[in-house]
Amino acid sequence: LWATVSTRQRPRSADWTPRANTGFIVLMDGRGARIAADGLGYTNECHVSPDGRHLYVNETYGRRLSRFPLAEDGTLGAKEVIAEFGSGEFPDGLAFDAEGQVWVTIIVADRLVRVDPRSGRVARMLDAGDPTHMARIEAAFQAGTLASDDLAQAHSALANPSSLAFTGPGERAAWLGCLLADRIMRVPMPVAGHPPPHWAWQEQAQ
């Protein structure tokens, strides 16, 4: 089992800067818990790739989608940056589709993007961003003054999308969890999702 810890800073907003580098990934197994990767830019959601070869993780304030090769004992190899995000874009949640592409939710910019792990190409699939809001948050981020109040107001219906999960017949829809919304949103998807590994646990147990 792998878990992410976003920051060692107190308050956590002290790491809401381009210099964020205190996040880490913890590996938990029969030998206990230990740090498997360190020095990351505000580690957020992580997932094992469908082929089981890599652990993918969003570095929210590092503004990167990164991955680590997985060894058989669960340890992680050297980090590889798959995609970097631009002004006003902060990656949060992620999920894989049936074609091995990575879907990433972007807070502040209120976007849903699809990343090709082979080329690093980022395709914008859903965009509700407010350019004025994005510019204001970007300025505070660069100045090292970004605070909770800056992120507390919704500027679109997506309202800071922080997670997604494929659902429905053929996995052709997705639920979006949004930090500032009072509901979970369901959107149609152009491609089927990849079933998460835990869906097969009961089958494996039998």
Give residue ranges: language-model regions.
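Short loop/turn segments immediately following the C-termini of beta-strands
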Residues: S6-R8, T60, L70, I107, ...
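A short loop-to-beta-strand structural motif that recurs across blades of beta-propeller domains
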Residues: G23-V26, R64-S66, R111-V113, R183-M185
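Beta-rich, blade/repeat-based domains predominating
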Residues: L1-W2, T7-Q9, R19-I25, R34-H54, ...
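Short loop/turn segments immediately following beta-strands, especially the blade-tip
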Residues: F68-T75, V115-V122, V187-H198
